[in-house]
Each structure stands twice: as structure tokens, then as C-alpha cells.
């Protein structure tokens, strides 16, 4: 039995000018099926899950470090053999991750904005950083299932300018046998 699950989470949203209406965007979650495991995101057990990210006014992201619109997403894995007691979701670095901030780089036309990941406690998750490997990041396996909650929000790197926001991040869910 392989003790990891790998996948990619694609993010989409929109920064709108103050006079425009708010339209909806979303997070597309893609992940492979692992033999013997059922993987779902927000209850969707299809190959691609969808989590609403939404849109935000540029006014809410006027200054560097401003954050807006946190949206929760969950990763659930079922069918885990009982030998595994804990899991850890690690968001990988890569071409779409800002190595300095761990934020997800916008690949669309909105300016001065990244997507920031948050853990269940609301702390910033720096994709690609080993700072994710802390004891509070381990999620217990209960009755053969693990349920990991995260959030994603917009984060300004300067005065955000209108346009679409799109990025993605790869993740690996590791399964562990930890002594009590």
C-alpha cells in the first residue's frame, strides 16, 4: 500500500473594480485516485472537485499584506489501513509558488495579488516550505478516514488591480504510523 496521495489544486477568482458587480470564481481541485483509497474534496468524489473562491473588490486589497475572502476547502481520504494513525498534507513548491512568501503566484491578469493558504487554525501555510512540518499539522486518522481543513484567500502584494486570478499548487498527503 502506497502511503501518499498526490494531487493538484487549481485556484481561480477575480479582483473587481470598485464599481463592478461581484462575480463568482472557484478553486478546482484535481487529484489522482490511489489504489484502495477514496479521495474527496468538499464531499465531491469525482476526479475534479470544485470549491467556490469568489471575487473581491480591489478596495479590500489596497495595501501590501491586505487579505480578503477566506474560503474553506477540505481534503478527505477514506479506506486508510488501520496501521496508519496520522496524516499530513504538504503543499509543494514549484513554478506557481512565490519562494519568498509561500503564496501562490497569480497567472492571470489581476495585478499585485497572490492566493494565500491557511491551515485549520488560520495560520499562513507557506507552500514549499518545511515550516509546514509542525506537530499541529498532523491530522489523526479516525475509523480509516482523515479529514484535513484548509482555507485560501486573496493577499495583496501592492494595490491590487482588477482582473482574473488563477494559480495552482501541488500537494502530497502523507500517511504515518505514530506511536501514541
What are these regions (language model features)?
Residues 1-180:
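Mature extracellular/passenger domains of Gram-negative fimbrial/pilin and adhesin proteins
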